[in-house]
Structure formats: structure tokens, C-alpha cells
């Protein structure tokens, strides 16, 4: 019922009546294929998975009349669902591990007897507020160097690991490594601070930074930092 659009005619005249009837398939299939919007962040990182995302398939653009649910597998594909040949509306109900929920509502035209595929992507969760290191004099606990010493030029080695670890089970090799140095910066009230952070202005050497939306970010994982070169006089 509902899978076919049916109709017919009855012809009457002299003698026997004739009937002509027809049935036209009125359903098609909908499916979804999902990817990461930033594979440089997610590839090889077990904190991210495109499996388990759920999407609702709706008859109306306000998404109040749900027809079916689609769930992604480890390759980002879903099974097909049969729906009436028409435009359906699809939105994400729950995001997979490590991703933000996509709040967009997508339309998909389904034709009778055919399979329509919606291609979508999710944005990985990242830390976009980067950590800042402030260098101070240990004895005075202030950001003023003593004598002819300097707090600028201290070098810190940052190591990022694509996974959640503690100090006892860190892998032997980091996924990416960076070396940065402290730079003197003066704030609005005239106070000078000696700062290092993961940005090109502070970078001495190392891998490229992870980028998203034009900014350096950190993917989900573990970060360690260690001072590997003291500034002059320390």
C-alpha cells in the first residue's frame, strides 16, 4: 500500500464493458554518505570516527514528520530506506565520536525506482584557543629578568599525540612536534610579558600546525610541553 500510484478507466458501450487499469511505482530509495570535513585532523586519529552518526529522514522541511533513520557505518555509508518519490529532508540527530553536530537541514529529491544519495561532512572538534606559556623568574616570581639575564628566547618543545594518554603510556614517537621560543610582548597597561605559544610567530622548528578555518588548532589528543633551552642568564 502506498508503493504504487494506481488508476484506471472503464469503457462502456454496446455489448461488453472494458476496463483499463495501471499501477505506477511511486517509491524510491534514500541513503547517505558521510565524510570528515578536515581529514588532516581526523585521519589516523582514533578519537574521531564517522561511524554511528544518526540522521532523520523527514517528509517536511520543518522536520516534524519523520519517515526513517539513517545510521553511518565505519566507512560513512548508510543502508537505503524506501520513501515516497518526492523531496525528503534530512538532518543529523547525533554526531559520531569527535565531531560537532551538523545543524543544517538538507533536501534530497527521490525519484521512483531510483536510489538518491546525500553527501555530507561533519566538522571535527578541536581546541582553537591555543595554550600560552608565560615565562617568569623563578626566584622573584615576576616577569622581570634579573641583572643582564633575559626571559626572551627560552625554547619549549611541544609534542602532540593522536590519542588520550598519560605520562606512563605515551608512545615512543609523537604524532607531531614543535619547538617555540618566548617573545617579549607588551600589553595595554605597558607591562611586558614573555610568551610562547603554538603559532608561526613563536615557532623555531618542527612540523606544520594543524589548521581549521584558517587558524592553528589542536585536534583531540594529548599534548606535552618541556623547556629544552633556557634563556640567556638562566
Range-by-range predicted roles:
Residues 1-234:
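Solvent-exposed loop/turn and edge beta-strand elements of beta-rich ligand-binding domains
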